[in-house]
Structure formats: C-alpha cells, structure tokens
Amino acid sequence: SLTFTSGNWNVAQTVTVTGVDDAVVDGSIAYTIVTAAAASVDPGYNGVNPADVSVSNTDNDAAGITVNPTSGLVTTEAGGTAQFTVVLTSQPTANVSIALSSSDLTEGTVAPASLTFTSGNWNVAQTVTVTGVNDFLDDGDIAYTIVTAAAASADPIYNGPNPADVSVSNTDNDVAGITVNPTSGLVTTEAGGPAQFTVVLTSQPTANVSIALSSSDLTEGTEAPSSLTFTSGNWNVAQTVTVT
C-alpha cells in the first residue's frame, strides 16, 4: 500500500512489480496490478479509484524431456548394470508417461518399464537401470538400444514428444571351447573293464557341432559312441564317452 500526506502528496512513490516463475509452459501471461479506491478522511480523496496497471509476464519455460547420458553405457553378460536418468524441463498440467523397452532382450533388460511424471515430481530425475543378459554365445560385445517411447499425456504440450534413446554395449563373457575331463589317468582292463570321460562345450553354438572319436589302437581299447553331437539346446550338457 501507499500513503500520501500533506507533506509528500506531490512526491511520486515507486511501485515495483516482479515476475514469478510458474514452471509451466504457458506463454506470456497478462495480469493486472489493481489499485484500490483511496481511503481518507479528506472527502475529496476518499473513494477516488486510480487506474489499474496492465502487466505481461514473459514466459521462460520450455517443454522438454532430458535423458542423461544417451550413450556410452556398458552392461556385462555377468549381469553388470548401467543407469541413466530422465527428467522434464517444465511442469506439466497433467501426468506424463514414458514407456521404456530394450531393442534386444537377449543382450539387456530395462527397469522400470515406464516412468510417470506429475506436476509434483516433474523436476526430480528418475533413474532407469539397464541389466546385461548372458546369451551364452561367443559373439563379442553387442550394441543395443533402450528405446524411450513418445510421451503420453493429457497435457497437449507433453503429449507426443519423443525423448532420446539410449545406446548401450553388452560386454561378452563367453569363449568358444571344448572341455574334456579327464584327459589322463584312465585305466581299462583286458577283462573288459571300462573307463569314462566327458565332453562339453563352453559356449552355445549357432549350429550343430560334431566331434568324431577313435582309438589309436583298436587291439587295446575301443570307444563308444564314435561321435558326439552338440546343439544349441544341449551344448552345456556333458556327454559321456566310454572306453572299453
């Protein structure tokens, strides 16, 4: 309020109007500084209503979705994880939902499956965790993507914007190999006493793997079976070979 006296009536008093940040993308908004009718025991001034003042508040908010980081994430086939965050750049007028998915579930999974931002938590970054998956293939490090779907909201400004996807690499931990156990110390007898060893692959093949078996001296011992076949379904199941 302002007070004028018989001593300062002719000295202009300054009123300062300060804009307020509403965090909403609403453009420049007009509002009014209302000057009420004057109150005074001087009947000449009592009730006189000065002009109101029109003001426009320039908006400084922009709708957007920030994903950080969007590249350089690394997971491992041993279950190693990586994380990124998502946050809005302005306050929405309705809930904003963003679905998340992995482009290759054999390399990595994402949690949670969706994010929801409200008018209360829009500026609080939400964390997304990406977990590597072991595919058992000796296929090297594989790149995949966490796909951020277009936002869905009853707020027209936030309905449809598509945030950046996130690039991830899953570090391979598989090595192609064949394990034979044991490789020495087996004993057979001329009375037909047998001995056994096992064979198994160390990673999943992309096609059948056949291994032929033979004895270096059929007058001393024979093997059964004479060949082994491993598939993508039984590669990690040890197969037994009997020597007689």
Report residues per predicted region.
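Intrinsically disordered, low-complexity repeat tracts enriched in Pro/Ser/Thr
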Residues: 21-24, 28, 44, 48, ...
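Contiguous beta-strand segments of beta-sheet-rich domains
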Residues: 12-41, 47-49, 55, 86, ...
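Intrinsic disorder/low-complexity segments enriched in polar/small residues
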Residues: 14, 78, 84, 92, ...
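Short, solvent-exposed loop/linker segments at beta-strand-coil boundaries, enriched for Pro/Gly
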Residues: 1, 102-112, 215-227
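Beta-sheet-dominated interaction scaffolds and their linkers
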Residues: 2-8, 54-85, 89, 112-119, ...
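Extracellular beta-strand scaffolds
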Residues: 10, 63, 123, 136-137, ...
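A generic structural motif
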Residues: 62, 91-93, 105, 175, ...
